Regions:
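Acidic/His-rich, divalent-metal-binding segments that scaffold phosphate/diphosphate chemistry
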Residues: 1-67
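Conserved active-site and cofactor/substrate-binding residues in soluble primary-metabolism enzymes
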Residues: 7, 11, 27-31, 70, ...
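C-terminal binding/interaction regions
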Residues: 20, 133, 139-193
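Divalent metal-dependent catalytic cores for phosphoryl transfer on phosphate-bearing substrates
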Residues: 46-148, 160
Length: 194
């Protein structure tokens, strides 16, 4: 068994790729990781790596186990078997409302706040002329949230409630995550096509 503290990003990325083959899901994991690392630097800088890896692995089981009966329960068991600690696994469990795991820590609240928003920001970037996260602005994102036909699978209430649970204004949360994703634009495929 590999102790979680010895699992670096490379090992966690390998775990993601072991269970996730869908390129969009991999990019989503990287997007959430970038947002989580940014929030860790702001709220809990001593644990940036943990926050980042929670973001990276929050949906690693979803590609193979997509039902509410399976995800994130199967992933939590895999992480337990790999030696990840309870607080790491609990954060991942808490991002899915239907698990009933109440979000208590800043890391758990940040994961919930970043998950749906990262997907929505990706969708906003992909409809821009250059398909670039650098073209996305908070005001246009908030306006797009009102268009229920756009990125319809993204839960807007989760985005709003996530920001509120973190104690930040929605516009500030959106801007913060845009900046975080800009820092990872190359790996997200959102650097632009110019």
């Amino acid at each position: 068994m590999v102790h979680w503290q010895l699992m670096d990003r490379e090992g966690s990325l390998a775990l993601l790729h072991e269970y996730t083959k869908n390129e969009s899901l991999i990019k989503h994991a990287l997007a959430v990781e970038s947002c989580m690392r940014a929030y860790a630097r702001k709220l809990d800088s001593a644990h940036e790596e943990t926050w980042g890896l929670v973001g990276l692995l929050h949906d690693f089981d979803y590609d193979q186990f997509p039902t509410q009966d399976e995800h994130p329960y199967v992933g939590e068991k895999i992480l337990e078997d790999r030696g990840y600690p309870p607080e790491f696994r609990r954060a991942i469990m808490s991002h899915a409302e239907y698990t009933g795991v109440v979000r208590e820590t800043p890391m758990e609240k940040a994961l919930f706040a970043c998950d749906e928003l990262a997907g929505f920001l990706t969708a906003c970037a992909l409809v821009k002329p250059n398909k670039s996260i650098f073209e996305v602005e908070a005001a246009s994102v908030i306006k797009k949230m009102k268009d229920k036909a756009f990125a319809r699978s993204v839960n807007r209430d989760d985005i709003r409630n996530g920001a509120a649970a973190l104690g930040v204004e929605l516009a500030d949360h959106v801007s913060f995550c845009i900046q975080a994703m800009q820092g990872a634009a190359g790996s997200l495929g959102l650097k632009g096509v110019t």
